[in-house]
Amino acid sequence: MKLLNVRRHSSNGFTLIELMIVVAIVAALAMIAYPSYSQFILKGNRGAAQSYLMDIAQRQQLFFNDSRTFAPDANQLNMTAPERVQDNYTVSFAVDLNAPPTFLITATPKSGTRQVSDGPLSIDNTGEKLHGVESW
């Protein structure tokens, strides 16, 4: 009796349909995740700017205690903006030396960055914080 030698050939790859299904699933997940990621980056950059503005305001108060005037810029306070802030915001100082002396520090989003839609952030000598027209 002779046995037939039949070999089974197994497929060791993926079919085109299986690959297309995986690509479609990955694309759907990316469409869901990207807006959340963008919001995460926006909030992170805003948080960095808020923290920097708080640091400046605190140093302004210390500077005022020593010199009875507010510093006109961050250089006088020996401060440098963190990279996240430098890349996304322009920080400006408005100092009024008339009695009583006041300051307003504003971080305005740079054009061409994600932060443009976020609006300016500011803090004054009383500690009042503004985000556009709202408080932080």
What positions do the PLM features span?
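Periplasmic/extracellular, small/polar-rich flexible segments of pilin-like filament-forming proteins
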Residues: 65-136
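Alpha-helical hydrophobic helix detector
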Residues: 19-36
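Membrane-proximal N-terminal amphipathic helix
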Residues: 42-69
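N-terminal leader/signal peptides at the extreme start of proteins
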Residues: 1-14
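Internal alpha-helical transmembrane segments of multi-pass membrane proteins, especially GPCRs
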Residues: 12, 17-21, 42
